[in-house]
């Protein structure tokens, strides 16, 4: 019950109205006529990426991929931060005030909910708690399993080595959740079990590499 209470408190930090406002930015100053250099435009106008994706299908996939990658890295960083506080601040900033919450479960879950809002907006879909109740419920339900696994693995591995699997699982769980949301909004269906398993295995490896890179930047002696 304490964890659910933490999630309820943390959810108040996520404002879908801000996502809707960002997605509604006027694009007159950004776009000429087609054909568009999608990568070049996104690089030159990153603050308009959500609005571009919402309005123009050509921009959706790269914008959604960037959202998934960014939030997955944020959650991996937070998993590292909870175990090794000095590993993060000088390299990255997690996107919001995570330190206010005692439960890492609450922080990681709510960051995924924020990702769900961003992906819905980029997909041209309605954004908000009421419109996305099913997706948000699935995020909350799925999150407890893989975060429990992360804690179990980290607890069985000597200090230092245990940081990598914890961060990798946080990364992978977030990444697969993002892929599932992307598929749902693009195709109207869920990923199959085989698709989830394959995506998870690939994402765990990506999460390991990212966590190792972060630790090497701050602690060169880390493996």
Task: Put a short name on every predicted segment.
Residues 106-109, 130-143, 163, 167, ...:
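Alpha-helical transmembrane segments of multi-pass membrane proteins, especially transporters
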Residues 112, 145, 149, 173:
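Catalytic-loop motifs flanking and including active-site residues across diverse enzymes
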Residues 1-87, 115-132, 167-223:
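Terminal, membrane-proximal amphipathic helices
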Residues 119, 123, 127-154:
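A structural-propensity feature for long, helix-poor, extended segments
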